[in-house]
């Protein structure tokens, strides 16, 4: 019995390793370009910066792109932390404050219809 389990696991691991080797690596997904990137590249190409800038012209669009990606990842990170660390809202589980509930003749709560119609007692 143990030998058959061992052989089954070995076969499974072999098949998984062959499957991983047979698959060519997937190309990196291209980030869709927005009009803002094209505009910033055009400004950088035309020398839109100050003359005293020490940054090369090609670094500015890359920095802008990285900044935009960083803000996206920060926003998604906030969503994940909220989902994973969702503390229950105490007001959500607290029953509504019901003022003016009258007691019936025998100490039981009257329902809304019984209290308004006067048929409770």
From Swiss-Prot:
It holds the Pfam family ANP. Stereoinversion of L-Leu-84 (in ovCNP-39a) to D-Leu-84 (in ovCNP-39b). Keywords: D-amino acid, Hypotensive agent, Ion channel, Ion transport, Neurotoxin, Potassium, Potassium channel, Potassium transport, Secreted, Signal, Sodium, Sodium channel, Sodium transport, Toxin, Transport, Vasoactive, Vasodilator. The modification D-leucine is found at residue 84. The keyword Chloroplast does not apply. Residues 50-70 have a biased composition (Basic and acidic residues). Residues 90-99 have a biased composition (Basic residues). GO terms for biological process: cGMP biosynthetic process; receptor guanylyl cyclase signaling pathway; regulation of blood pressure; vasodilation; venom-mediated edema in another organism; venom-mediated mast cell degranulation in another organism; venom-mediated relaxation of uterine smooth muscle. GO terms for cellular component: extracellular region. Residues 23-44, 64-82 form a propeptide. Residues 1-22 form the signal peptide. Expressed by the venom gland. One of its GO terms (molecular function) is sodium channel activity. Coiled coil: none annotated. In the C-terminal section; belongs to the natriuretic peptide family. InterPro entries: C_natriurtcpep (IPR002406), Natr_peptide (IPR000663), Natr_peptide_CS (IPR030480). Residues 22-70, 80-99 are annotated as: Disordered. This is C-type natriuretic peptide. It is found in: Secreted. It comes from the Eukaryota. There is a cross-link at residues 45-46 (Alanine isoaspartyl cyclopeptide (Ala-Asn)). The keyword Ion transport applies. Venom component with vasorelaxant activity. In vitro stimulates the production of cGMP in rat aortic smooth muscle cells and histamine release from rat peritoneal mast cells. Induces relaxation of isolated rat uterus. Induces local edema following subplantar injection into rat hind paw. Forms voltage-dependent cation channels which are weakly selective for potassium relative to sodium, and whose conductance decreases with increasing dehydration energy of the monovalent cation. Venom peptide 1 induces slow and continuous calcium influx in IMR-32 human neuroblastoma cells. Venom peptide 4 weakly induces calcium influx in IMR-32 human neuroblastoma cells while venom peptide 2 was not observed to induce calcium influx.
């Amino acid at each position: 019995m143990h030998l058959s389990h061992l052989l089954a696991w070995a076969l499974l691991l072999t098949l998984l390793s062959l499957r991983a080797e047979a698959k060519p690596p997937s190309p990196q997904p291209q980030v869709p370009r927005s009009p803002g990137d094209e505009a910033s590249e055009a400004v950088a190409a035309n020398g839109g910066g100050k003359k005293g800038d020490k940054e090369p012209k090609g670094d500015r669009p890359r920095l802008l792109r990285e900044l935009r990606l960083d803000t996206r990842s920060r926003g998604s990170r906030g969503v994940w932390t909220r989902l994973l660390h969702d503390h229950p809202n105490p007001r959500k589980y607290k029953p509504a404050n019901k003022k003016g509930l009258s007691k019936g003749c025998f100490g039981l709560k009257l329902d809304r219809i019984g209290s308004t119609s006067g048929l409770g007692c």
